[in-house]
A protein has these predicted regions:
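Active-site hotspot residues in diverse enzymes, especially metal/ion-binding acidic/histidine motifs
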Residues: 1-174
Length: 174
């Protein structure tokens, strides 16, 4: 069984990693490259999976399914890669993959445990792509409205939905 990682730790980890790079647009491909991860943007049929992190022969491989819209530098592709980076950087996920406790295919995993692990990786992705310290500066004392969210989504190259969720998580107060 994999233990849950506190969200505060996930946020701190993702923000720390993002802020190692000066670019406002978190360079997820560069992060993967700097970690020595091999990325594969390939077609695996639509609906099979978005992304998958595999540990094999003492090395991590990340597969991104372009048939599901996960093209390099697309909003969906960036979020999926950031999510997969969550599986790599969150200790419990990485160790679980290394020890075979976690398997790359959801159908072989305990549903409740899988949901928690996937939510943690989603939260990591959100924090990595929209680090609170940078994002807070953009939304400080601004009212939530569609134009603001659309503008921020474009600036951070994320979906409007991901941006709206992040705005709701962080808020626009001091």
């Amino acid at each position: 069984m994999i233990n849950n990682t506190p969200l505060s730790h996930i946020k701190e980890l993702a923000e720390y990693i993002a802020l190692q790079y000066k670019e406002k647009l978190t360079p997820v491909d560069k992060i993967a490259e700097d970690e020595g991860l091999e990325l594969f943007y390939d077609g695996y049929e639509s609906g099979t999976f978005d992304g998958m992190t595999v540990y094999l022969n003492r090395k991590f491989y990340v597969h991104l399914n372009v048939d599901s819209g996960n093209k390099q530098d697309s909003t969906r592709g960036r979020f999926t890669l950031a999510h997969e980076l969550g599986h790599y950087f969150i200790d419990a996920h990485r160790v679980g993959l290394q020890k075979g406790i976690l398997v790359p295919h959801s159908s072989k995993t305990n549903k409740k445990q899988f949901d928690t692990i996937e939510r943690e990786a989603d939260y990591f992705a959100s924090c990595l792509l929209m680090p609170e310290s940078r994002f807070q500066n953009e939304i400080f004392r601004k009212k939530f409205n569609y134009d603001l969210i659309q503008n921020l989504a474009t600036q951070y190259n994320v979906s409007i939905t991901a941006c709206a969720f992040r705005f709701a998580q962080i808020g626009n107060h001091p």
